Amino acid sequence: MLTGVRFLLAVAFALLCAIVYVPAQGPAKPHVVFVTGDDEYRSEITMPMIAEILERRHGFRTSVAYARPKPQTKDNIEGLEALETADLMVIYTRFRALPDPQLKRILDFSKSGKPMIGLRTTTHAFLYPEGSPHASLNDGFGRDVFGQKWITHHGHRSTTEVTIPEGQRGHAILRGVEPFHAKSWLYHVTPLHGTGNTVLLEGRSIHSDKIGKTDQFPLTQPVAWTRSYNGARVFFTTLGHPGDFESPSMRRLLINAIFWALGREVPEGGADAEPVTPYKAPETFDLSKVG
């Protein structure tokens, strides 16, 4: 009888060990939330394309928040509740005046210490009227969180040659990223706000409308950098024209930055950035074609 009891105890102990020591099947899928709301550069099209790459090629979980009922709607972005479970926020908005509950979700995330990525017009993500309690965000959000507010650009007829500054080639975000020609017109951003900004890419304006004013608005400016905010890793790029995303280097830059911001190892040679669905850049200004 004693032998039988010992046997049963041994079996029970073995089962308990099996339960306790089952190896993990890998980390949980990172949840990346894309906040869109820039009808000028069609972030409602470009960001879902990046989200699809993350899901299908890298096993991430993604959510996309959209301006509703149409991309031009400035006072409503639906889907922001996804930020409650997000590991990282990618925000690409322009001149929004969101109601308090929606704004609070974005601001709460920005203060959470979790990583963030911003693109182009997020230097001027919000536009609240004078006298609004949120008017300080018009300049303050882009400046304080991402390193600069809206200042000016080099003209809608210009383009940008993107290069890697000397000494930055070895940065993980730049794995597999080569110099490329961007359709984005160059933003003036210097001097960047605060300390701890690391410039990863520079752009030189081609056919700038600031010729004659280059002492004030130099033809070369940072176009991608890293920094920290509330202890979180932050990446920002002033690129983001829909035509830029036809470049593998632009897509890889953003996906590498997502890996880096999450503290994940960027693959040697850079992350797979091939679109899952063939991508053709939409027009930027023909807003009648926006759904």
Put a short name on every predicted segment.
Residues 45-49, 101, 105, 168, ...:
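Extracytoplasmic/secreted proteins, especially bacterial periplasmic and envelope-associated proteins
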Residues 55, 61, 73-74, 84-85, ...:
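Catalytic beta-strand/loop cores that center a nucleophilic Ser/Cys/Thr
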Residues 91, 96-176:
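A glycine-rich, often tryptophan-bearing local segment used as a flexible ligand/cofactor-contacting loop or short
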Residues 1-5:
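N-terminal secretory signal peptides that target proteins for export/translocation
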Residues 6-20:
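Bacterial N-terminal signal peptides
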Residues 37-40, 157-162, 240-248:
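Active-site rim elements
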Residues 29-35, 39-125:
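Helical hinge/lid and interdomain linker segments adjacent to catalytic or ligand-binding clefts
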